[in-house]
Amino acid sequence: MEKIKVIVVDDSVLMRRLICDMLESNDNIEVIGTAINGQDLLNKLKVMKPDVITLDIEMPVMNGIETLKAVKSLKIDIPIIVFSSISQKGMKYTMECLYLGAFDFIPKPEKPFELSKMKDDLIKRIRVAYSQNTNKNPAPINPVIRRETNRISSDSIEAVVIGASTGGPKALYKVITKFPKDMNVPVFVVQHMPVGFTKAFADRLNDNSAIEVKEATDGETYRKGVVYVAPGGYHMEVDSNSRIKLTKEPPIWGVRPAVDKLFISASKIFKSHIVSAVLTGMGKDGSNGTGIIKDNGGVTISESETTCVIYGMPKAAFETGKVDLVVPIDNVADEIIKIVRGLRR
C-alpha cells in the first residue's frame, strides 16, 4: 500500500513533534513536511504534494481560518483536518473552518502530552480523508430521485428529524439556513460532534438562519418553528409529553448522540407524521431509524452520493430499501419544506 503523505502545521515545536511521532508510528503514513504557520504551508505546497494536511487553528502570521481560505483559493483539493482548542474562541473558529471546507476536526487537549489519547482517532480520520479524496469521481449532480417502490403517503407532518456526521456541519448549514421562520413543525438534529462543540455549532446556525436554532436541553418542551441540536455526549429523544429527553445511555454504532436513537424515538411519537433525512457521514447510524420511520408511514430522505463528503450513512439508509427520496444537498431543504407543507405527493 502506498503511504499517505501528510504535512503537519502547528506553531508549537512540541506539538509538531508529538503529532509527527504519532503519525510516523503508523506504517501507512509518512510525514513529508511540517510548517510553523499558514504562510509557511503555502510556501511548502509549491514543492510538496501531500495527501492530507493537519492544521492548527490558532497560529501567528497566518492562522487556520486564513490558511484554509488561501488553500481553497488556490483550487488545491487536499483534505484538511484541523486541531481545535476547547476554548469558546477555539470552538467558534472550528465551526468557521468546517464551513470553509475543512474535512474534519480533532479537539486539541489542554496538555500536549495528552495528545497520545487521540492517536487512533487522528489516524482513522486521516485514512478516511485520504480514501475519500482518492476515490472521488467527478460526476454530474443528479436531480431528486424518487424511488418508485415507495409511495410518499404521509398526510400531515408534525416533525422533522435529521442526522449527519463527517461533512455534516456544512451540509446542515445548507439545509437549515433555508428553513423559513414559519416552519410549522419542530426540527430535531443529531450531528456527531464532541462535547462542547454543539453549542457553538447551534449558535452559528442560529446567527445565519431565519428559523430559531438552539442546543437542546433536558426536559424542555419542544416548540414548532425551532431547530433542536443534540448536545455532544448525549442521546436525544422525544417523549409523549412534548418534551426532549437527553440521556447518557451507551453509545450506538460507537457514537453518542446517535441518529438512530433520535429517529426511533421520534417515530414512536409522531408515527406517520414525520420526515427524516440522513446526510453525509461515515458508518451506518440512521439506517435502522430510517427503516422504522418508513415502516410507520413516515417520509424518508437520504443525501445523494454525488454531494456527500462521505457516502456512508446515506448509503446504509438507502440500502434498507426504505428511502423515498434521494436528494443532492442543495435540494434537501426544498424537499423537506414541500413535504411539510403538503406540496410533495
Swiss-Prot record:
Looking at the record, the residues that make up the Response regulatory domain are 5-123
Alphabetically ordered keywords of this record: Chemotaxis, Cytoplasm, Hydrolase, Phosphoprotein
What's the record's remark on domains?
A: Contains a C-terminal catalytic domain, and an N-terminal region which modulates catalytic activity.
The answer to keyword Cytoplasm applying to this record is: yes
- What NCBIfam families does this protein's entry cite? PRK00742.1
* Protein function: Involved in chemotaxis. Part of a chemotaxis signal transduction system that modulates chemotaxis in response to various stimuli. Catalyzes the demethylation of specific methylglutamate residues introduced into the chemoreceptors (methyl-accepting chemotaxis proteins or MCP) by CheR. Also mediates the irreversible deamidation of specific glutamine residues to glutamic acid.
Task: List residues traversing the bilayer.
Answer: none
Family named by the database record: Belongs to the CheB family.
Q: What is the lineage of its organism?
A: Bacteria, Bacillati, Bacillota, Clostridia, Eubacteriales
Q: How is it modified after translation?
A: Phosphorylated by CheA. Phosphorylation of the N-terminal regulatory domain activates the methylesterase activity.
Q: Which GO terms describe its molecular function?
A: phosphorelay response regulator activity; protein-glutamate methylesterase activity; protein-glutamine glutaminase activity
Q: What is this protein called?
A: Protein-glutamate methylesterase/protein-glutamine glutaminase
Q: Which GO terms describe its biological process?
A: chemotaxis
Q: Which EC number(s) does the record attach to this protein?
A: 3.1.1.61, 3.5.1.44
Kindly indicate whether the keyword Cytoplasm belongs to this entry.
yes
Locations listed in the record: Cytoplasm
Name the gene that codes for it.
Answer: cheB
Report the principal subcellular site. cytoplasm
